[in-house]
């Protein structure tokens, strides 16, 4: 492995069917940059609706992008403590939207939140449960406020609870999207987080399972209608460079990837695939091959700079001596 500037180049022999060059940036990247890019990318209504339909409705086009409405992602609930002082609970979701679902001639509303994780969160079920509970609590408080304002008739029980018998809550669903390259080894439900007890005790505790999207486990990429599916598929192969090369060079969908998706891939998995600056789409297959060739040339320049002879490089890189000598002359001219 060679380190050239901030670029890592992994190589075996450089010719034939043997390991080809992989041209990477700092793989760790900035967690803040990844979080910002993930939020920006998934906030798009088309991709948001696509994710919901693929994950929640088996690909059926239930949620339409045009029927999504951005909601305040701050979950706030104020309650009175034992000393009659108000206590405020506040959490910040990544994304929250109201969706309209049409079914059998009826129209329903639901709230869908998306939490994106670039690292495993070992308390995710409780975190999601708190988000959802705060939202339901806020809905109840809003219903009580509305009833007080209207001053309509109510029973003693309805007055005490603030929530009337006919009142109903808007369903809240949270999708957790894991964008890390490592396997998710965290809990997937509340029961996964509980200490081991008697099965009879477990049966008494309601479970809370999260809707978890893990690219490495997805086998339903055909459900996606936007390039979000391709982005998740690249993330799935991000730790297997041969698989990624095969995906990018053999799947025709990657010949016309929108630049936003390519930029998301670059940030989320730490690669540096050049964007097409002359248009809105990038041929990732060509960009991959161009980048591989540039990495090949960069490695040869580095070997020349370190004192390797053209003959040694020719044998290592499986290149003709003429090709290496041409790069040698180019390198010499640049040095001068």
Predicted regions and their residues:
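Elongated, amphipathic alpha-helical interaction scaffolds
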Residues: 1-336
